[in-house]
Amino acid sequence: MLQEKLTMNRDFLNLINESLLNKYHPAQSRLHEAINYSLSAGGKRIRPLLVLTTLDSLGGNAHDGLPFGIALEMIHTYSLIHDDLPAMDNDDYRRGKLTNHKRFDEATAILAGDALLTDAFQCILNTQLNAEIKLSLINLLSTASGSNGMVYGQMLDMQGEHKTLTLNELERIHIHKTGELIRAAIVSAGIIMNFNDAQIEQLNIIGKNVGLMFQIKDDILDVEGSFENIGKTVGSDLNNDKSTYVSLLGLEASKQLLNDKLTETYDALKTLQPINDNLKTLITYIVERNK
């Protein structure tokens, strides 16, 4: 039933993939080839889907959110390229394919990530949205991805290796490393639609919860998943001696926390009076997915 409902997002997904995969041309340069390699590696596109679906569910024009969604996916992809490098997570596979530095080389992978990060902001500048909204979106994206957002979360994650973290410390890592871009995806819809502060705050609550749920589910899949489904080595977090929700709480308690966060999220979403269930369905997919 859930998969049937998700077919509503197929048009959005096709639009996102078409926009992403037409940005860089592998024949143009080795750099473009490396960028396109990672962009075309078959990700779930959760972040841009959240942008478009939130707009759609709240009565906005989903197409207005496409440039911001593409920018988010570019920054997310750059972060994965860099995270996989030997100096950080030292992973050989991502999404079932060789990681960028394994397929090309470390220097090319670093430059591919650098280019994606830089080009992402150009996506927002090239939109037809008014200047005030563009500035707000650039502020949202830079805050979510920079030294107080995703990059900060990655630093905390590295510092937390080979340590037993408290639950609060673990949540702090994932609010920043995983959660900030997901929060930005959902909040961007409110900025584009000129929501008031109270409405934006509800989107912030939803976005924060969805970000945490995404990570809790990833930690569960690191135990229960398979290489075929998740596209990376099962148990890699345990092998790297990283604290996870499962290692701190246990599997069943992690699943209960996931369900509790989902209930909170549904309650916050109701206050915004969505015109359809598309966002609720996508959030449910994030919690119930097997990859």
From Swiss-Prot:
Residues where isopentenyl diphosphate binds: 44, 47, 76, 95
Cited Gene3D superfamilies: Farnesyl Diphosphate Synthase
Cofactor binding remark: Binds 2 Mg(2+) ions per subunit.
Cofactors that this protein relies on: Mg(2+)
Residue ranges of coiled coil: none
One of the record's GO cellular component terms: cytoplasm
EC class (word): transferase
Residues annotated for (2E)-geranyl diphosphate binding in this entry: 94, 177-178, 215, 232
One of the GO BP terms on file: isoprenoid biosynthetic process
MF GO annotations: (2E,6E)-farnesyl diphosphate synthase activity; metal ion binding
Signal peptide range: none
Residue positions binding Mg(2+) 1: 83, 89
Protein family (similarity comment): Belongs to the FPP/GGPP synthase family.
Protein name: Farnesyl diphosphate synthase
Originating gene: fps
